[in-house]
C-alpha cells in the first residue's frame, strides 16, 4: 500500500511540475506565409553570397567501366 501511495504521489508531482515547463518550451506558432517569405529571403541571400571554390583534388574511384 505504501509503495502504491508513494508511486502515485511521485507521478502526480512529475505531471504537475512538468506542465509549466512544457508550456514555456512550446515553440511559438509561425504561419506558413511567414515561413515561405523567410525561405524566399534566404534563397535570395544565398544567390548573392556565392563563393568561388576551386576544383577538387581527389582522384577518381575505381568503378565498373570507369578509369582504372
UniProtKB/Swiss-Prot annotation:
It is found in: Cell membrane; Secreted, Extracellular space, Apoplast. A motif (SxS motif essential for MIK2 binding) lies at residues 56-58. Residues 1-25 form the signal peptide. The keyword rRNA-binding does not apply. The keyword Hydrolase does not apply. A motif (SCOOP motif) lies at residues 50-64. One of its GO terms (molecular function) is LRR domain binding. Keywords: Apoplast, Cell membrane, Cleavage on pair of basic residues, Membrane, Secreted, Signal. GO terms for cellular component: apoplast; plasma membrane. Belongs to the serine rich endogenous peptide (SCOOP) phytocytokine family. Brassicaceae-specific phytocytokine (plant endogenous peptide released into the apoplast) perceived by MIK2 in a BAK1/SERK3 and SERK4 coreceptors-dependent manner, that modulates various physiological and antimicrobial processes including growth prevention and reactive oxygen species (ROS) response regulation. Interacts with MIK2 (via extracellular leucine-rich repeat domain); this interaction triggers the formation of complex between MIK2 and the BAK1/SERK3 and SERK4 coreceptors, and subsequent BAK1 activation by phosphorylation. This is Serine rich endogenous peptide 22. It comes from Arabidopsis thaliana. The gene is PROSCOOP22.
Amino acid at each position: 500500500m505504501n509503495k502504491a501511495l508513494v508511486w502515485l504521489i511521485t507521478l502526480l508531482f512529475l505531471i504537475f511540475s512538468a506542465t509549466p515547463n512544457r508550456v514555456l518550451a512550446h515553440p511559438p506558432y509561425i504561419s506558413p506565409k511567414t515561413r515561405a517569405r523567410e525561405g524566399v529571403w534566404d534563397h535570395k541571400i544565398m544567390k548573392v553570397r556565392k563563393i568561388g571554390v576551386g576544383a577538387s583534388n581527389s582522384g577518381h574511384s575505381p568503378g565498373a567501366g570507369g578509369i582504372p
